[in-house]
Amino acid sequence: METIFDYNQIKQIIPHRQPFLLIDKVVEYEEGQRCVAIKQVSGNEPFFQGHFPEYAVMPGVLITEALAQTGAVAILNSEENKGKIALFAGIDKCRFKRQVVPGDTLTLEVEITKIKGPIGKGNAKATVDGQLACSCELTFAIQDVK
């Protein structure tokens, strides 16, 4: 897959930083509509120290956060939203179907389905080797950084 935005370019679009920046590169992008990102899950991730030391599994809330960051790239790279922030406003119909473990390549796909004013919605899914790991509907609010 061709890289559309690399790690450093992602940091120019969304405000997240280590250890909370959870996407490594963007491989598909349609401004304001769709984004596909990749997260290479390493055994060195700080969350694996406690989740769980003897059975490392990526926390589901961090998978949903990685999906939200992917959606934020789709929204915040547009000229009208540059410099703004996208905040979680809701997560619906969230399901976890497969554990994500060190060594996995997590593919994160978000399709923006609706934007009305500062509020938007998107359908999101995370897969590993084509197997569904997580799916959900995201609601977000776009606002200026104060």
Swiss-Prot record:
CDD domains: FabZ (cd01288). One of its GO terms (biological process) is fatty acid biosynthetic process. One of its GO terms (molecular function) is (3R)-hydroxyacyl-[acyl-carrier-protein] dehydratase activity. The active site is at 51. The keyword Lipid metabolism applies. HAMAP family: FabZ. This is 3-hydroxyacyl-[acyl-carrier-protein] dehydratase FabZ. It comes from Staphylococcus aureus (strain NCTC 8325 / PS 47).
